[in-house]
Amino acid sequence: MKLSGLYHDADVTHRQPLSENTHQDPISSQDSRKNSRTPQDPRRAAQIHRQCTSSASNLPSNGNNSIHMRFASELPDQVLQPMYASQNQTTNSQCNFTSLPYQPNYDAYRSIESSYRESRNTDRGYDSNFRHHSHRPRGGKGRYDSRNYFNPNSKYQQPYGRFFPRSYNRRGRGHRLHDFSNRPADLSYQQYMHPNYEQYNPDLRMNNYKDVTQLTTNFNFQAQDYSMAFSQTSITTDPTYVQSDNHNYPTKTQTTPETTKTKEHENAKDNKEHKKQQVSTSPDAISLSYRPSSQKMDLIKKIYDTEVIPLPKEALIDNGSYCGVDTQKYKKTHIRCRSIQKTKGHSSQTINKHKVQKHNENHVPSRSDLKQRKSNQHEDEAVTEARDFSKLDPLLSPLPMTPEPTLNFAVHKTKIHSDSELHHTKKNIHRSKTSLQDRVLISKHAPRAPTKDNSYKKHHDPKDTNDPKMKHSRGRTTSKKNTANSNGHQDVREVAVKNVSGKAAKNTSKKSDPSHNLHGKTSDEQYKTSPDNEKISTPPKSKTHHCIHDSSSSEEGQYKSPNNSESNYGNCLSDKFYDNFTKTTPNSKTNHKTEESTENTDLNSFSNENTNKTEIEDSNIIQPFSQLFCNETIIPSTSACPTQETPSTMNRNCASKKHSAGANKNLTDNSPIRSHSNPSSFTAFNKSNSGNSTMNSTSNGDECTDKKPNCSSTENKSETSNQTNGENSDKPLSKTFTEVSDRASSRASSRASSRASSRASSRASSRASSRASSRTSSRASSRAFSRASSRVSSRASSRASSRASSRASSRASSRASGRASGRASSRASSRVSSRASSRASSRASSRASSRASSRASSRVSSKASSRASSRASSRASSRASSRASSRASSRASSRASSRASSRASSRASSRASSRASSRASSRASSRASSRASSRASGRASSKASSRASSRASGKTPNNKLMSNIPSPQTYEKTSNKRKPRQIYCDSNKRQIYPHDTSISTEAEVSEIKFRCGPELNFYKNAAARLQSFNHNDQFYNPRFRPHIRTNRKKSESTNYTDSESSTSRSRSHSRYSPDSLNTPKRKKHKSGSSSISSSIEENSRSNSRTETGTDKLITFNYQHSRTRSSSSSSVSSSCSSSRSKSWRKSRYKNSEDPATYSPRSRLQQLEKQTRPKSASRDKTKIKSPNHESKHRHADMFRNSQKTGEKFPLDNSSPSNTHEQSNHLENAIDQEQKKTPKTTNTTTNTIYRPRDNQSNISRNTTKCKKKRTRDDDSDSSMQNFFKKRISGTQKTDSEISEIEEELSYREYVRRKEKKESAKYKIHRGRVSTKDFRKLFRNTIRAFEYKQIPKKPFPENKLKEAVYNICSNGCSNTGAIIMYFTRSKQVAEIIKTMQRELMIRPNITVSEPFKMNHAPPNYYDKDAINQFIELQKQGPQELWDKLENNTHDLFTRHSDVKTLMVYAATPIDFVMASKICNKYAKDKPKEIVLRVCSIIDGDNSISIYNSVSRDFKSKYLTLSKC
């Protein structure tokens, strides 16, 4: 049969021929278009073609009523797939599966990239139903929306970066110009004048329907995107329910189980008795939402005979927006699945045993062995193939949600992957951007595959019970493989054997069997027996269990030894065995991979089990452990925690290489990674993505830490041991693995898995790590976190978990540091990593991470990690970092750790992490941990940390490291990657970047002095009076563009920056506050203040500091200075920290050597230049009035005379005294002075002694001193008097009011009120003759309801146009349009633009505002002088005429201007005609002028040839 694509037909064998198209495309009326003479736009043609070829909506059912497969492309309409409702799935029925939300465009002949490009550019006809309002593009984010479709380069592309869409012309926004420069040539005039935006709907993912299951034709996914491959829809053959021609509303497919009988699958037949338990059976119709490539069709056919587990509809729900899913239904399904599994399990056990034995015999961890095993596995070829198929690449991650699986997890026999499959999977991982995201729920809370009778319970984190979302794995629900590994029902004996049987001989497996049975059964039975386990911790998921699930594909060599019992014991043995193991197993990457997977997976189970089973297992462990070990079994994983380091290395490496493939498969396979969503096992996979690995390891560590706070100490140990093991025991091994991991991670999964994993792991780890970090922190700072630690359960589990987490953290941190060291020296990177990790941990303690930020960070981290540095550096850095971190962590006192670590780490890591590419992943994990630790540490710790950090900041990196480490070191290295993003240590604490972005070197300062003058005041009054220095107010008038100013959030962590930000409502105030650095959420104040002013600010600040002498180099963190420091930073910082980092980087790129960045060099530099910075900052700065005055001068909106001169908000008298300072400015100044920026609380107490403030204020890099009114420094007194003189001094209540949340509009209103009060302007108009009043310092525009111009008489216009065009050249003329600001006029102008732009050779400007200087009357003398000069000739006039200046402020008007140029006279005449038509309609609001340009030329040179050609022909022909 033919499945029709957009431009191609894929031949697919199918029982049903496609019936002809039954649907008309509602979007394009084909009659008009087919008959129109204009050539068809390819998009429209494509649409028509699609309609003609789209598959039939009514496929007759097969006569036998057996289920027939359908491809999504066959579903009713390719253009508009119906919205298949999840509602009509009855809760008791097995869930109806709807076709995938997107129907990928499978082009057999194009690469993914080209197909992607093509599909982006081709019209995907979306139903107008799904279009948001034409003025409100989805999320404002579409590439083409009503505003910018015509001009992809438009600055409105991302409408102001706001997260909420704005209608086009909210209040006085500029009139949008529609640039048709990229329009297809063949759309008709009507189509351009009334474009149908639905065609250009960029992205169905932005669909506003919550349960978007609509299929769209091309989602540019190719043959290999199969993660959503099988969605089961009960396909009704009843024509009533098939989508009818009316697509204007999505029709829901109805489930009619009576009409279609379920074809009983073979497995189903085997398990008929179990199927009775299912409440109802809905038809298992499989609709493939991809167009299978030919080589996959056979697999597909086979799959139809097996039970295919589709992705749960809710699988992706964690991605976010689709929260409307009926989670209760899923709960029920879970329960049902579990119960069915119990019964199913027994039948499959025998097979599993057989398989296990077979694997034990045949298993060699080599690829050839994999093939061999595959050959051994005749019985379930079909199932295996099906599994492979299901493993094909996941569809794009953003898929909203997939239907939940109807089938209870089908029991599949063990599946063996061939090398080609592994390769394919690897490739797929690399390919799909979110390879894991769809498949794997990383959170340890979503252990998906039921393993034993308790399987769900076992893998279900107790916390998950309340969170149905978490219950479903994000990815395809893994069908329960009855691999020995995945089958929860097989005997523990088998599981253990299989797990153990990495390389083991038969005898090994046998030997290990009894012990493993013991352990496995013990753990499993304990699970069953002790329901408490669920409550206490993730059910032990005995290592065996984990192994079972994690190594769902045992073939991949991911046999996990039953690490349950051994994990505790393994902690002890880890060092010993680690060496042996590394020596023993270096050859079997499979083993390593297994170990890593096992260990990662096992971290959770391990910690849990440890909690529950420590005593039991200790006795049991030793024998099996030694047996297994002797047999070269991969038991080292048994010492999951101990070996955790090894596996961590191996995880990073093997996992990255093999696990990326294997884990990918496993994930898809329902491998425990998926089913458990073990962050640990996932971590193994993530390790392939260096960035993610950080997070993952963090999550592992967190999970370990879940159990106990010991993690931090363990982390210390683990890091030490890790460094010991990694360095000493097996350098070559670690090297190989590091290389492998670097390669694999950067290559294979870096992007896809990193994003998915980062998301999943960020979530999972956020939970786990929150717990872990709180506990870890609790250990480190026993006092601060005593609360958190109190929760921790048994000692053994804490030990094991702490060790595992420490190992994971050391691993992650070492890897992160390795990456960082790729840039800085390995030594620097080690510091960086420890710093970064400590910072991450501090961050973790600092605040709960927002989901979005974690996602973003994960994305960034994946990118960064993929960029990861060379192996050597990674190795060295990992060692160094592990050493440093272990040292630091061991050393850190409980108190210092929480405080200093958060502070110092934030500072050091900020410096290092700004460099470290690993930033994001660490951020995710740290964020997760931050949640817990923030909870645990609470405010006291934040205060303490601020103090400690100020202390620590002065100290050497080692001190910082030590202090830092106490925070979960799990994050330590992880955080290294992620740090840059997280700028806040605590939700209350603000962290200072150790990496000073201020102008830090004397050379820089001197250069600035040289360039800017010592006062940085080269503009004197003029700059202050020019609105361009008042932050471009005239161009971005917030009064008319309120969306640019959102309401200020109350500054929570009030650094002086915060209070400033809240107080300095005025544009850039806070922007310049160095602390703004910590509020990386850069709210672009008014479209950003002019760069000049900001640079001046910075320079002045640095200058002032330098001059202060005590503080030669204050870190003026540029980025923060630029941000509107709204210091509820915990939320904002996460999002913008990456941005801030990049800003900082870019800022420093030129000025500083990268070495300066390395924490160490930077620190040394800073230490040399300044005495302990923290001290100098807090004390010297605060205390030296001199400095303060300079500082104030540096701060734009603080009123000092200098400031006033530079950027006065007030009307400056010509004498530059600026004594009439803006009331508002003064108020701001006072607020800034007064706000006690205390550490944890925003106090409105205006008067606070500066000393207290300095002590309290968290930020040690305070560029701006909190100047309280009590301050006696000269500058403040000057300010005080100035305020008195201005007569607008605020009362305290007024100030506190402003300090409280003021909307920008309110702020502007007050400011205007004060200004008006000065000039006694109350209401109404100001006389146009009173220039001083008119040109006061205000941000209001001159408003004109009517244009202050007369219409251009049409006759004159015609004559003027005729004259300009009479010589055959039109480039000496232009048309100027003036128009007022109103919605109606804006619409007219847009229409005019559109009409102009469909003509050739026309250039239209965007509407722009004008800035106006005050008028000035010249006296007779000046005019006489001018006349005299004029008489002397042009040169004299030019040379001798004096410049005249004014001392008022500029104003802008809301009259807008637009210019039109035409390249040829024909176009000029037509443009004039068009413009005049619109000007005549609104003569009082739109005025046209024609102007001639002396020596005019075309706007751009591309028209020159056209103009010349026209002119030559014109002249030639006119002579004829």
Curated annotation (Swiss-Prot):
List the subcellular locations: Host nucleus
**InterPro entries according to UniProt:** Herpes_IE2_3 (IPR005028)
Pfam families according to UniProt: Herpes_IE2_3 (PF03361)
What ranges does the record list as Basic and acidic residues composition bias? 115-130, 260-273, 358-391, 450-470, 510-535, 1175-1188
Q: Name one GO molecular function term.
A: DNA binding
Low complexity composition bias: which ranges? 250-259, 686-701, 746-953, 1059-1076, 1089-1105, 1124-1140
Where in this protein does the record put region Interaction with human UBE2I? 1024-1072
Q: Where is the composition biased (Basic residues)?
A: 131-141, 424-433
Biological role stated in the UniProt entry: Transcriptional transactivator.
Could you list this entry's UniProt keywords, alphabetically sorted: Activator, DNA-binding, Host nucleus, Host-virus interaction, Repeat, Transcription, Transcription regulation
In the record, the note on similarity to other proteins reads: Belongs to the herpesviridae IE2 family.
Segments for region (Disordered): 1-67, 115-162, 239-290, 340-406, 418-571, 583-611, 640-987, 1033-1278
- Output the Gene Ontology cellular-component terms: host cell nucleus
From the Swiss-Prot or TrEMBL record, give the protein name: Immediate-early protein 2
Tell me how this protein assembles. Answer: Interacts with human UBE2I in the nucleus. Although this interaction does not promote IE2 sumoylation, it represses transactivation activity.
Q: Where is the composition biased (Polar residues)?
A: 16-30, 50-67, 148-157, 239-249, 278-290, 480-489, 550-571, 600-611, 640-654, 663-685, 710-727, 955-973, 1158-1167, 1210-1219
